[in-house]
Regions:
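Bacterial N-terminal signal peptides that target proteins for export
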Residues: 1-7
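Short hydrophobic alpha-helix segments
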Residues: 195-197
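Acidic/histidine-rich, surface-exposed loop or edge segments in extracytoplasmic proteins
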Residues: 33-48, 77-88
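N-terminal segment of the mature soluble domain
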Residues: 58-59, 63-137, 148, 186, ...
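Solvent-exposed, acidic/flexible segments
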Residues: 46-57, 92-100, 136, 170-177
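A short acidic/small-residue loop/turn micro-motif
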Residues: 199-201
Length: 210
């Protein structure tokens, strides 16, 4: 009798172990578009995020256009805005092009001809096309033919830096960011314009940036 009870209990345990667990296979949360200029209520950390990129570039655009030495010239100056001399020396992981691309594109739109933008980051593309025209591989196009490519008057330089503090007791991480922007006179090596954007964030559970 005892053996039969033991065998029955063992069989029940085996069947229970082989049974399919109660998994929640319901659909997850639907994708929702967020305003890029606001902080997410679900995913947010102490790094540089979309709302920071929007805020800093909007501020720099207003400041540049309000600077007579840059945007108030009789002959629109030529400027280069890319990430070549824009360094990330911070502990935050970010694609620098997110900042410089938005700054260049939105400034170009807002300047309305007061600034001329030199696409040095597309220099290889232009060189190949110019070579094809001059070798007779293609015709000269319909716009113009010049001996040299456009030289620039100013170029963007700057850096992202940060200062971190971590509380072992509470697990809170604090990060202060300082982002500098400068337009350099490419003939005299002087700084024609400077802008600074800074912010500080605290969080207990940081997020992973990719």
């Amino acid at each position: 009798m005892t053996f039969k009870l033991f065998a029955g209990a063992l069989a029940a345990l085996i069947l229970a172990g082989c049974a399919t667990p109660n998994l929640d296979n319901s659909a997850g949360r639907a994708v929702v578009y967020q305003d890029v200029s606001t902080t997410s209520k679900r995913v947010a950390g102490v790094g540089v995020e979309s709302q920071d990129v929007v805020s800093m570039t909007d501020r720099m655009i207003r400041d540049i256009l309000a600077t007579p030495q840059i945007a108030g010239r009789a002959t629109p100056p030529r400027i280069i805005i890319d990430s070549e001399y824009f360094a990330n020396d911070s502990s935050s992981r970010i694609n620098k092009n997110l900042i410089t691309d938005r700054l260049r594109i939105e400034l170009n739109r807002a300047a309305q001809g007061r600034l001329v933008f030199v696409a040095r980051h597309y220099g290889d593309m232009v060189s190949k096309e110019r070579e094809a025209k001059r070798n007779g591989e293609t015709d000269k196009g319909t716009v113009r033919a010049t001996k040299a490519k456009a030289g620039a008057d100013f170029r963007l330089g700057g850096r992202i830096t940060s200062l971190d503090a971590n509380s072992a007791a509470s697990g809170t991480l604090s990060r202060y960011h300082q982002i500098s922007f400068e337009l350099i006179d490419l003939e005299y090596e002087t700084i024609a314009w400077s802008g600074l954007f800074e912010f500080k964030k605290e969080a207990q559970d940081d997020v992973l940036y990719r």
